[in-house]
């Protein structure tokens, strides 16, 4: 009897994980492929693609483009009428956007100015937000992006942004 129980225990340890792995849903089916970000232009395009779409879409690519401790910080109007940064972690931003469900938005950088030194860069970009990929812009604003190159790719350390609805019209020098 002891031999049978021991054999059953060994079989459970060896075969159950294998069977479970064979029947588990494939992570590849739900994981979004993230394009390379070896240049600032690739990073900008990948960021637009990663934040755009339905609120509840897979954000694996966004997580890969941002450093683990990255901050996403919109400038918001406070109840007393002043303006203040509202710093979010990557998870905070994903949870907030997921509340939109299937409702989508599409962000597009229309002008990007990048300053690089060594392994870091600052991107000053004018963005437009649309309700559909080719629809009219409903919001415009400015992003300030801090990016770091690890020797193989660019990743985002922080994004600070403010829409024109709080800051006023976009100055001509930031328009395409």
Across the structure, where does each feature detected by a protein language model lie?
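Short beta-strand edge/turn micro-motifs at domain boundaries
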Residues: 22, 140-169
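Surface-exposed, charged secondary-structure patches
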Residues: 23, 71-72, 84-134
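Bacterial N-terminal signal peptides
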Residues: 7-17
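Positively charged n-region of N-terminal signal peptides that target proteins for export
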Residues: 1-4
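Hydrophobic pocket/interface hotspot
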Residues: 47, 62, 70, 123, ...
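A mature extracytoplasmic/lumenal domain signature
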Residues: 66, 76, 125-127, 160-161
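Short, low-complexity N-terminal intrinsically disordered segments enriched in polar/charged residues
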Residues: 22-65, 174-176
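N-terminal, post-signal-peptide region of Sec/Tat-exported proteins
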Residues: 55-82
